[in-house]
Amino acid sequence: MGCVSSKLVPEPPPNAHLVETVYRQDGLKNKANRAEHFKHTSNRPREDGGGGGGTKNNQQESSGQGPRTNKKVKKYRDKFDPRVTAKYDIKALIGRGSFSRVVRVEHRMTKQPYAIKMIDRIQGKEVFEAELNVLRRVRHCYIIQLVEVFETPDKVYMVMELATGGELFDRIIAKGSFTERDAVRVLRMVLEGVQYLHGLGIAHRDLKPENLLYYHPGHDSKIMITDFGLSHMSNGPDNYMRTTCGTPEYIAPEILARKQYTVQVDLWAIGVITYILLSGTMPFDDENRTRLYRIILKAKYSYAGEHWKDISSLAKDFIDKTLVVDPNERMTATKAYNHPWLATNAATSSQKNLHRTISQNLLQRQSTRANSTKSAKSTKSNKSNRSGHSLRSDRRRVQPEEIEELHKDPEVQAELASLCSIHSHHSQYNV
């Protein structure tokens, strides 16, 4: 593998933490006392010895901050524990979710940029526990790194690397060219990270282009896997999961079928990502969620259109071996990484420029989604406490009531019956 740090490491004991720097609120109950205490420690060097740079950075910070920007920054700075602001200077809000905010910060001593995710400890309990459980245990060059953690009774502050190169598809749109070989380079990095995770018994469960970020703006930047809020780590020999979660267009059939599943769901998502990388379109796409899920359950996709004539048969074979309804027949991460399309890319992958078609399709999809989001926001009650962005985030996730509705559909019930027969022939997935 091309990553120096990609060697699998043994899973630590349950009570071990690879990230040892965890600050918990102790006897300094009074906020003023805490601020005074940490004022004298703000110039200490980092306890964990150094950092790097990733979490989503979808906004460019302006060189000159006006009064309005300063007011915004102050608003979020005031919400942070004094221990955090004593060590890190809050620069800009770069993301938000239902129970979290992500800010760009700068280490006061080293001037190194980082991202801090502030999570509501009560409302976001399930998410932050899953994310911390995984990130404290992983060390890989294609996976975003956790640097340190601050905890209070009501908030958790996760200091993480900052990826400044933007999202995968934004880079493709901005780039002047994109070939199969470029797609292969991206997928090799992603699969190297996924192999590492699966080797530790970790399923990401929300792989999608928005969670694949470039480390820096340079053309030679690596890809980083981010957002482990839905991830799951096996605690024993039973490597099955049952939670219904994910993003609709990327969710695997076995999750929709409410069957127990394994890390193989990540390979389905990689198949979807690959299809989009090579065409700029979704393999499974419908504004109606029930219809979308029906299509996914059947793995009903095609290579229609002139554009696909320029795509190699090996690339299509790679997609065909990941978008398989039966997870036992689906390629594992290791087999996908060693697939001929990826393994022989330097010699055989097409150099035909796919950029025009892909970028046009991606831009069209972005425009459609933006209009859809505006429509969704306009129909929401003004009494909602959530921001427009969090409404958008909730809408992008699979909702339990949608799956309930799906299972009432007679056509789907027939499809699920055939899936049950597949599952009955396999007692264990090949992972």
Describe these PLM feature segments.
Residues 101-121:
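Glycine-rich ATP phosphate-binding loop
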Residues 186-187:
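Activation segment signature within eukaryotic-like protein kinase domains
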Residues 154-167, 171:
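Conserved short submotifs of the Hanks-type protein kinase catalytic core
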Residues 1-85, 412, 416-431:
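Intrinsically disordered, low-complexity regulatory segments that flank or precede the catalytic domain
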